[in-house]
Amino acid sequence: YIVGTPFGKEFAKKIVVDLKEAIITKENKISYINRKIDKNPQITIVGESIMSESLAYAISTEKNKTVNVISSLETDEKLLLKGDKIAMFEDDIEKCLKNSKTIIADPLFRPICPLDSNFISLPHEAFSGRIYRDEIPNIINKSL
């Protein structure tokens, strides 16, 4: 199997290559594993681990930005890159975000983000349910 969500054009291409390779090698692979982590990222993504890591890879590849992830749901740590975090409680997430410049997250996380941060709303049904369903963009195999 291949782990990853094909966000963006470049990451979608990488997943296709990884799938073809996995057919031949019979080895599982996490497609976003080679993304670079930065202690002071330009962007922080809060959300479910695989989708967030995939989006982080896509943004770092297509936009040449440093991106880190905070998984706000319980997840296997092997699905996160070293340096990314798991924070499931609001207080913990808020602490992780205190120095974040740009944050991509479900709109329900906005109240715990620093007031001076640039907040980019990315609704997810696991968090806000159907409230913002009409605002969920389709970024699969699309330029970011």
Show which residues each predicted segment covers.
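An N-terminal assembly and electron-transfer interface module characteristic of large anaerobic redox
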Residues: 1-144
